UniProtKB/Swiss-Prot annotation:
Protein name: Putative competence-damage inducible protein
This protein's encoding gene: cinA
UniProt record similarity statement: Belongs to the CinA family.
Species this protein is from: Lacticaseibacillus paracasei (strain ATCC 334 / BCRC 17002 / CCUG 31169 / CIP 107868 / KCTC 3260 / NRRL B-441) (Lactobacillus paracasei)
InterPro entries: CinA (IPR050101), CinA-like_C (IPR036653), CinA_C (IPR008136), CinA_KH (IPR041424), Competence-induced_CinA (IPR008135), MoaB/Mog-like_dom_sf (IPR036425), MoaB/Mog_dom (IPR001453)
Entries under SUPFAM superfamilies matching the protein: CinA-like, Molybdenum cofactor biosynthesis proteins
Gene3D superfamilies xref list: 3.30.70.2860, CinA-like, MoaB/Mog-like domain
Membrane-spanning intervals of the chain: none
Extent of the signal sequence: none
């Protein structure tokens, strides 16, 4: 048995994004004992994609196509494969109902290209998309088996874990149940985490360990197999415990579809507390991230965006002379912003951000210098200084995530 992975997307071919999906899929194939000697990357071009499929067929009996299932004109994967196999595309009623509900919620018309997301090659088995809208597929055609998977990692990984791996286990004769646990870390780089886990990774057999980095955080996926799910879970526990013993201080939560914002809101709910924020260089990004979490309105009533010294003084009632004396980029300003915002919003906890996003310096402070304030009811406010690398957007994003981690740890203390 041999498998071949074809990643579809011009942005991958041009180096605009990294093909992390291919690496993840390859590791899963290895864990199942399925040989994979070739990978291809093809742009969004039907004829060239069909050439890649034919080449894969000549040397592999499992062809896994990743990407190109979306609604845009350059998403051609399922159409190309269906035409190659001389099959028509048919509609999955459940996927269409989900799509219609989403379109109705967004109050926009249903378009033919959108409908394509709910379609699959006739005769295929559906691979359910738990996160997005584009269905995947498992297609047996003669001596070959084909798999269609979505490109966005947040859709791809859950589909692989929950829909594809059980099928691959049976297809390969690997009868055991596979269970994965996803650990999420922030505040540590992938290289440092891998160094910390070096011996665990070097000696891994079952469970296996895979690390990934995205948006300044690191994800560790631990996968084990067993005769039953309970047996596989029992194998996971010692490995997860060993990882937590080494880098638990950077851990914030479990799950593929998780985030610092979601964990923060969940912890606010568990403590029945309210949060607010006062933002300067992040310009509301912290509050926007909170606002993306369903149900947050119970725990976040509002906050402040105070970009200039004048608005800090006016909106937060901080003495302008004190601000001018200490400077905008200072511990004083971070503490004052956090505490005054907390009082004005009558919140239990408050986070503030002030600093230099770049590229220019400010008050003699280099780009990347960020003060984050933290104020809690009944406690003195505190301030922490950071020197974040990267461009303007990187600095702002790192600041937001660091502020969330600070608030999360304060609530968990």
């Amino acid at each position: 048995m041999q498998a071949e992975i074809i990643a579809v997307g011009t942005e991958i071919l041009m180096g605009q994004i990294t093909n992390t999906n291919g690496a993840y899929m390859a590791k899963q194939l290895t864990a199942l004992g399925i040989d994979s000697y070739h990978q291809q990357v093809v742009g969004d071009n039907g004829p060239r994609l069909e050439e890649a499929i034919k080449l894969a067929e000549s040397r592999s009996n499992l062809v896994i196509l990743i990407g190109g299932l979306g609604p845009t004109p350059d998403d051609l994967t399922k159409q190309t494969l269906a035409a190659h196999l001389n099959r028509k595309l048919v509609e999955d009623p459940d996927a269409m109902a989900k799509l219609q509900a989403r379109v109705k919620q967004q109050q926009r018309p249903m378009t033919p290209n959108n409908q394509l997301q709910a379609m699959y090659p006739e005769g295929a088995d559906i691979l359910v998309n738990r996160v997005g809208l584009a269905v995947g597929a498992w297609i047996v055609n003669g001596q070959h088996t084909y798999v269609l998977l979505p490109g966005p990692p947040k859709e791809f990984v859950p589909m692989v874990d929950h829909e594809l791996l059980p099928r691959l286990a049976k297809w390969s004769g690997h009868a055991e149940v596979m269970v994965s646990r996803v650990l999420r870390f922030f505040g540590i780089g992938e290289s440092q985490l891998v160094t910390d886990l070096d011996d665990l990774i070097a000696n891994q057999t079952d469970p296996t360990i895979a690390t990934y980095i995205k948006d300044h955080e690191v994800t560790v996926r631990v996968t084990a197999s067993g005769a039953t799910e309970k047996d596989a879970d029992a194998k996971l526990e010692p490995m997860v415990g060993a990882i937590m013993d080494r880098d638990g201080q950077y851990f914030y939560g479990y799950g593929d579809d998780n985030s610092l914002a979601k964990e923060l809101v969940k912890t606010l709910a568990a403590n029945d507390m309210q949060i607010t924020a006062a933002e300067s260089l992040t310009a509301g990004a912290f509050q926007a991230a909170l606002g993306d979490v369903p149900g947050v309105s119970t725990y976040f009533k509002g906050g402040f965006v105070t970009y200039s010294l004048a608005t800090k003084a006016a909106f937060l009632a901080i003495d302008a002379r004190e601000l001018a004396a200490h400077g905008v980029v200072s511990a004083f300003t971070a503490k004052a912003m956090a505490e005054h915002a907390r009082r004005k919003a009558a919140a239990d906890i408050s986070v503030s951000f002030t600093g230099v996003a770049g590229p220019d310096t400010l008050e003699g402070q280099p780009a990347g210098t960020v003060w984050i304030g933290l104020a809690r009811r009944g406690q003195l406010p505190e301030a922490h200084v950071y020197h974040f690398p990267g461009g303007r957007n990187d600095v702002r994003q790192r600041a937001v995530m660091t502020g969330m981690m600070l608030a999360l740890r304060a609530l968990q203390a």
